């Protein structure tokens, strides 16, 4: 019997901030930024390769996102839920985070809780970062939205986009709030050749 234990990347980041360390390390005091880079460029890439292979065959899916309150469903039921999601409109679970340029527009208009600071980011359509809530009746499973991309890439992307980007969702939908905040940071994205040779990523990022 194969039980695949999973967790959302946002929850991993929150645990980094609480002092928890990376996979199979004991570096609790490592700066949060360094933990994130290790996860983003190494651990999550390794894990995604394993996930892609196991997704069609595991017997049970274990959601460990809610600490101390795991949820488990049969693998067949989980895959059926992903199939249904791919065939209809769906909404990802958004998350909001403060930053150096953060403002107050999102806090006011989205009725966000007071955090003693600001809100700079809204991630609301990034399968690599956001999650989905799947209702199985007896339990609700929170699962990385990236799993849907891996399970049904052509249904989500179409043949042409899938041929170019493979099992990756090439668009990031997020909102940056600077209202009554600071100037937005200068962002520099490398050329495709550079990001491929230095970071082993398939494509670079353009912004609009």
Regions found by a protein language model. Name each.
Residues 1, 44, 167-169:
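Short linear interaction motifs
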Residues 10, 23, 44-46, 101, ...:
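A residue-identity detector for tryptophan
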Residues 2-20, 24-28:
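Conserved phosphate-donor/acceptor-positioning beta-strand/loop module used by diverse small-molecule
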Residues 18-79:
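Small-molecule kinase domains that catalyze NTP-dependent phosphoryl transfer to phosphate-bearing small molecules
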Residues 58-63, 67-207:
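Transition-metal
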């Amino acid at each position: 019997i194969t039980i695949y234990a999973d967790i959302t990347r946002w929850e991993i980041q929150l645990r980094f901030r609480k002092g928890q360390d990376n996979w199979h390390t004991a570096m609790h005091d490592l700066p949060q930024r360094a933990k994130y880079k290790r996860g983003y460029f190494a651990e999550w890439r390794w894990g995604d390769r394993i996930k892609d292979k196991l997704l069609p065959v595991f017997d049970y899916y274990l959601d460990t996102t809610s600490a101390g309150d795991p949820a488990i469903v049969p693998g067949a039921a989980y895959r059926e839920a992903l199939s249904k999601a791919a065939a209809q409109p769906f909404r990802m679970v958004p998350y909001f985070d403060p930053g150096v340029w953060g403002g107050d527009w999102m806090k006011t208009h989205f009725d966000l809780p007071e955090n003693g600071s600001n809100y700079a980011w809204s991630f609301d359509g990034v399968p690599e970062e956001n999650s989905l809530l799947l209702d199985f009746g007896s339990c609700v499973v929170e699962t990385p939205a990236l799993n849907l991309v891996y399970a049904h890439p052509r249904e989500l992307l179409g043949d042409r986009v899938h041929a170019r980007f493979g099992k990756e969702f090439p668009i990031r939908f997020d909102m940056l709030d600077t209202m009554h905040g600071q100037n937005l940071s200068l962002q520099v994205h490398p050329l495709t050749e550079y990001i491929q040779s230095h970071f082993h990523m398939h494509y670079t990022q353009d912004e609009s």
